[in-house]
Amino acid sequence: MQAPAFVDKVVLHALTDNVLYDTICTSFIRDNHASRRGKGTLDAIVRLKGHMVDYYRKNGSADGWVLKCDVHHFFASIDHDILKAKLRALMQKRGVDMAFYDLMCIYIDKTDGLPLGYQTSQLLALMFLDEFDHYIKEDRGCRYYGRYMDDFYVIARTKRELQFLLKDIERWMSDLHLELNSKTAIFPLKNGLDFLGFHSYLTESGACVQKLRRSEIQRIQTRVKYWEKAYPAGEVTREAIITSFVAWDAFASYGDTYALRLKYAKKVSVIIGVDVKPRRKINSTRSVRALRRVKQEQNIRRKRGDITPRKDLFQPEPRPDSIPPWM
């Protein structure tokens, strides 16, 4: 898969900011988290915690089931004809000059699937499954659904319900010339859920705990071992180590990881001879309450007939939708 030339990226960046973003994102559901202003990994993690806690409160226990899906080679498998048909219909509906559509088609047809170097690829990929999102949330009534690009989950009361849903999802994917990969599975909610680098699980009291996955911990372990040898040998600078660790610490702070981050901050401090401190813990419980408060206020205004949009009380900092920054 090829990355676009620099000039192509500049053109697409301008097109995305001035035309494409508002055209495409208007219809997205709340639980479509990637590549959008005010969204990102933190928003998805906080939203998952809210879903799990809300499920426990409504059902009185963690006796539920999870369907976890992942689309196989998503970007590389996106069908150009289907994508362009969706984009054309959307632009016509929004009254966008079709010259922009013609320009987009030139870039789309440059490679198979969607090239990872295009800024617009993220939005086009989200749009490709937008109709699917609405089907899951509205037609199937799946309250506890979340998607981050090609990775999504559904929480339901029974395994049978999710088995039927999975058959529908497979038909949807087939119609889009996509397929789910082997990681797709149905399992008890009590087992917890791996999503975006964190393992989220419910305690007996109904609290949701979010820890870094073992694979993510192994990444920082490997990196620290490398620094222990490379820094004294002059193969890596102090500034590079600090930059890399701070990026990892920022990501890890999305979960309940303060003790873990403090442990590795001390290791890094010993290596470089400078006191490194982890970020303060993010109060995601407060974030969940803020999201709930926004929803309650929206319901009150809706009952009063006041549908004037209001800025959310909770706006997490967006993160780049790319490879983790410490890689």
Q: Could you tell me what each predicted segment is?
A:
Residues 34-43, 153-156, 188-192:
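Beta-rich nucleic-acid/ligand-interaction surfaces
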Residues 16-68, 72-76:
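Active-site-proximal segment of RNA-dependent polymerases
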Residues 51-149, 154-170, 181, 187, ...:
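Conserved polymerase palm-domain catalytic core
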Residues 1-13, 27-40, 106-126:
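Short, conserved non-catalytic motifs in the polymerase core
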Residues 7-12, 45, 71, 100, ...:
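Short runs of predominantly hydrophobic/aromatic residues within well-ordered alpha helices
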Residues 13, 107-110, 163-164, 180-327:
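Right-hand nucleic-acid polymerase module
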